[in-house]
Regions:
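His/Asp/Glu-rich metal-coordinating catalytic cores
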Residues: 1-17, 22-214
């Protein structure tokens, strides 16, 4: 694991807010806490559950503060607002920071799936309102953001899976990122619909993500 140097004088980090629970956003948290154990970790329920599981691997029990999309928290000099976004992991948020110096909007990772399986849309109305109020710095994370158009909706894979489950003569082997709960949910639903047995060979993080989302 390679992480940036975070040991500047006195480790001046006052709190850490994670927009979602993917490894590239939470993987360095235990190393940060080893420098300064009292840093409060802020995030949604699912995100913090994954953060706590990550910290448990390092025998660290963090101090956490749970937020939901729409919440506004005062974190030091920053008024911090959390906005719902859709992503390939549940419970993702964007973060808006307001201070006397200006306003920063950080989207975190997001996609514009208009028919998400979990019903959680990227809240463009909320983002538009923030834009109308004035944003001094807009920081957006999204793979292939420079390509025009939309990401194919997650529901598009449903008919493909259904066709395979309906016509299977042997076993179906499915691999998935542990955190992609919606992607795991689809084959489980078709397995039940067609009364097929299932054998799950979970990796470490698949077990933790599944337990967290249950």
């Amino acid at each position: 694991l390679t992480i940036p140097a975070i040991c500047w004088p006195s480790c001046r980090v006052a709190s850490s807010a994670s927009p979602h629970g993917h490894e590239d956003h939470i993987g360095a948290v235990p190393y940060l806490l080893k420098l300064k154990p009292d840093i409060p970790l802020i995030g949604t329920t699912f995100t913090l559950a994954l953060v706590e599981a990550k910290c448990e691997e390092h025998k660290i029990k963090p101090f956490t503060h749970t937020i939901e999309a729409g919440d506004i928290e005062q974190l030091g000099p920053f008024e911090t607002e959390f906005i719902a976004v859709n992503h390939s992991i549940p419970d993702s948020v964007a973060v808006c920071l307001r201070s006397a110096a200006g306003t920063v909007l950080h989207t975190g990772d997001f996609k514009l799936d208009q028919t998400p399986l979990d019903g959680r849309l990227t809240d463009l109305r909320h983002i538009g309102r923030l834009g109308a109020e004035g944003v001094d710095l807009f920081m957006a994370d999204s793979t292939n953001a420079d390509r025009p158009g939309f990401t194919a909706p997650e529901r598009d894979i449903g008919p493909v899976l259904e066709r395979h489950f309906a016509n299977v003569a042997g076993k179906i082997v499915i691999a998935s990122f542990a955190s992609h709960v919606d992607r795991i949910q689809l084959p489980m639903a078709f397995r039940a619909a067609f009364s097929l047995p299932v054998e799950a060979r979970e990796g470490n993080w698949l077990m933790k993500a599944g337990a967290t989302s249950a």
